Amino acid sequence: MERRRGTVPLGWVFFVLCLSASSSCAVDLGSKSSNSTCRLNVTELASIHPGETWTLHGMCISICYYENVTEDEIIGVAFTWQHNESVVDLWLYQNDTVIRNFSDITTNILQDGLKMRTVPVTKLYTSRMVTNLTVGRYDCLRCENGTTKIIERLYVRLGSLYPRPPGSGLAKHPSVSADEELSATLARDIVLVSAITLFFFLLALRIPQRLCQRLRIRLPHRYQRLRTED
């Protein structure tokens, strides 16, 4: 089905408005069947860097590993939007059952991506197309006895809009500044584009073909001249 350009899904608009209307930046992770309720604080999440991976574009795949998951424990993925950190979406499981799904499910490829194995290891797969609505921070979390723990973190960004936090997975050498790194990347791209352009320009002038033909003609004559001199 073809979507109109420039349109925004109504579900996403309502989701943003509802979150903007709330004064607190905390989200309840508990369910009616759970004995305790965990709260997810966005400000606290921003200061946690347990382990990070960066993805630029295409498809982002987040794999969360959990050990010794109990039936009462809640596991899932918390998504924080790149353009507004007060916008938080959750994908939660409890006892192999979805108790909360992402609001923007059109870009959630593996909606039922929970893969259970024998204890003690549990895997949770999240796969989404990288768009303007899905860029941001993905935190693998688990809620147990009223405590929220962040297991793994994935940053998804378009271009260089999302700032690199200190100690990120793509940390550069301390002796290299940001300006030097940007200049080196720009110079490398310019050299690469120039080399490709020159190659196709010479190819259009048939210079490589002519050079190969001249070598094929001259090499036998030189070999015959050497044999005559011997």
Curated annotation (Swiss-Prot):
Positions in the Extracellular compartment: 27-184
InterPro entries assigned: HCMV_UL16_sf (IPR038671), UL16 (IPR035123)
Membrane spanning stretches: 185-205
Gene Ontology CC terms, in alphabetical order: host cell membrane; membrane
Compartment(s): Host membrane
Membrane topology classification: Single-pass membrane protein
Topology feature Cytoplasmic, residues: 206-230
Domain of life: Viruses
Quaternary structure, from the entry: Interacts with host ULBP1, ULBP2 and MICB.
UniProt-recorded name of the protein: Protein UL16
